[in-house]
Amino acid sequence: MEVTMEDRSVKADKADRDDNNTTSTELLGKMRQTKVISTNQNNNHLIDRMVSIYEMEMIKSQSTETISDVSDVLEFTVIDNCSHGTHTLEHDLRLKGEPIGKSESVKGVSRSLIIQIGMTVIFCALEFITGVVCSSIAMLADSYHMAADVMALIVAFTCIKIATRPSTRLGYGWVRAETLGGFFNGIFMCTVCVLVFQEAVGRIINVHMITHPLQVLVIGFIGLLINLFGMFNLSGHGHSHGGGSHGHSHGGSHGHSHNNKKTKKNDGHGHSHANGHGHSHDGKSDCNGEEEPDHTRLNGKFRSASAMANSDANVRLLDNDDNSNDIIERRLSGVNSQNTIIATVDRQMTPYGTHMASEVLNVSSNNLDKSAQKTEQKKDKNVNIHGVWLHLLSDAFGSVIVMISAGFVYFLPTWKIAAYLDPILSISLASIMGFTAVVLVKTSGEKLLKQTPEGLDLEKVKKDLCSIVGVSKVEKLSVWTLCGQRIIAAAHVNICHPAVFPEAAYKIKNYFHDLGVHSTTIEPTFEDTCMQSMRIMVKKVVDGKSIEEPVSVSTENEITE
């Protein structure tokens, strides 16, 4: 893509620097102001989006002679004639962008797991010995289950420990190890169910009466107490409750530029999937309900350093010019005075040229009304700890079954059905364990496969995104669960032009925050048709006085494939 409009003031600045390079030290302070006006906005919601471009250049020479500062101002008025500038639909969204509250004590969970592992190992050995000596299939089954619990607890403890470790190879670190641990816990439970069922069927065929039922009854009671203690100890960690606000990691991956031209070495890049996920460009959603041809993919990255920190939004506009002297840095102040953009653009480009890769970092959320923050606490299920809790629950049922079967044998030794009660109750235990195991495997498996959260309508989300000013189409939308209630969203959207992208990205982030989405990745593609409909009014001002008549420049013929 090429934009041929010349920035004559920049060339003049370059010539002045060449003349004075060997004679003086010169400070050039130039300010460019750009006003973006959409002619299609509703009169009741007319907003003049202001973008100020500042350029400061320091040039030092060998001479000690100085001259007075020179201050030039270039005013660009961009008139947007595209059909995506109305605020009526956007107003219906009632965007708030409230930060998501979340807190969880990993240290407390680790301590609880260590205590539970120690007690479970000791009692597992005690149950196994008692089951063999007393010929109790329920006791042996419970000891097998305890052995599976030991493995599950070790997996849970390991996952929680490594989940907080940083990683340079994994996009989200080891945080998904919790979900993986929950999946393996479910597999362990399924294995135990098969073993218990097999032993119980064999005991029905070959009947064996429990010997020393009193000892079995006492051991079962101790096991019940241990399991109840573990369930109570971990029940406070199975969910994390809203309380403190936290930073959001908006480290977004970006797409790719479909350009046949040979780019520089510095600009050539593939996919940088910092978040560990890719994008496909099928399933396009046009805001007008029509399919449009693909445009040049202009790649963006959206991430936030902290939801409550005062940080700036940064945009780097990359070009293909080999001459580094033809690159200038501009500082753009966005619609919100707290939001800023750092840009690097080619001198030959208009302020809103189409060949660029945009990287938007954080937009401050200090302007949010803290009194409007969510007071409703959201329960966040930790799949890994929830899996351990299910193990302990089934163990508690197992201990109850052991006590029932041993109690009947102890108090009714002549009752013939008491011999069959032990294996029958063991089959019931296996059935309960199997049900909980299937649910756990299904839940963790869905999260590992990045399934869309239940109850979220992607088509409605696409329609809402198209209501935001400057968004013309949603090319691709993916929403999935990282772990617990940490939901990730990746949206490939078509934007009218770069002038409205920072504001649109800020509103898209707020929209997803209102949905409870933890992290948002935005990949923009700028519309050629909207770019061509823009008109730019250029006026040069020196010391507050206009020295040139406004010149109307149309971008219609400036963009060539």
Curated annotation (Swiss-Prot):
GO terms for cellular component: basolateral plasma membrane; membrane; plasma membrane. Disulfide bonds: none annotated. Residues 134-136, 198-215, 413-420 are extracellular. Residues 246-270 are annotated as: 6 X 2 AA approximate repeats of H-G. GO terms for molecular function: protein kinase binding; zinc ion transmembrane transporter activity. SUPFAM superfamilies: Cation efflux protein transmembrane domain-like (SSF161111). Residues 1-26, 240-304 are annotated as: Disordered. The keyword Cell membrane applies. Keywords: Cell membrane, Developmental protein, Ion transport, Membrane, Repeat, Transmembrane, Transmembrane helix, Transport, Zinc, Zinc transport. Residues 1-20 have a biased composition (Basic and acidic residues). Residues 247-264 have a biased composition (Basic residues). It is found in: Basolateral cell membrane. Expressed in intestinal cells. Expressed in the vulva. It comes from the Eukaryota. Residues 1-112, 158-176, 237-391, 442-561 are cytoplasmic. InterPro entries: Cation_efflux, Cation_efflux_TMD_sf. The chain crosses the membrane at residues 113-133, 137-157, 177-197, 216-236, 392-412, 421-441. GO terms for biological process: cellular response to zinc ion; detoxification of zinc ion; intracellular zinc ion homeostasis; positive regulation of Ras protein signal transduction; positive regulation of vulval development; zinc ion transmembrane transport. It is a multi-pass membrane protein. Involved in the regulation of Pn.p cell fate determination. Involved in zinc metabolism and the decrease of the cytosolic zinc concentration which is thought to modulate Ras signaling. Involved in zinc transport from the intestinal lumen to the pseudocoelum. PANTHER family: FI23527P1, ZINC TRANSPORTER 63C, ISOFORM F. Interacts with lin-45 in a zinc-dependent manner. Belongs to the cation diffusion facilitator (CDF) transporter (TC 2.A.4) family. SLC30A subfamily. This is Cation diffusion facilitator family protein 1. It comes from Caenorhabditis elegans.
